[in-house]
Curated annotation (Swiss-Prot):
Function text: This protein may act as an activator of P2 late transcription through an interaction with the alpha-subunit of the host RNA polymerase.
Keyword annotations of the record: Activator, Late protein, Transcription, Transcription regulation
Protein name listed in UniProt: Late control protein ogr
Disulphide-bridged cysteine pairs: none
Pfam families, alphabetized: Ogr_Delta
InterPro entries linked to this entry: Znf_Ogr/Delta
Length: 72
């Protein structure tokens, strides 16, 4: 949820689309019936706090029936 920049009431996201892999354009509409402003915001990745390390796949635990999943 975003607040309307004109009246400060809640504005709900109506739709969005990716501009790049790390930037999203989002359309909002103010929920205040006396305002009803529609505006666009941009959401983008600025930096990572933690990045995952290398992932090593392991075999899944056996199911209760004793069988294993055969996807590896």
């Amino acid at each position: 949820m975003f607040h309307c920049p004109l009246c400060q009431h809640a504005a709900h996201a109506r739709t969005s689309r990716y501009i790049t892999d790390t930037t999203k354009e989002r359309y909002h509409q103010c929920q205040n019936v006396n305002c009803s402003a529609t505006f666009i915001t941009y959401e983008s990745v600025q930096r990572y706090i933690v990045k995952p390390g290398e992932v090593h796949a392991v075999r899944p635990h056996p199911l209760p029936s004793g069988q294993q999943i055969m996807w590896m």
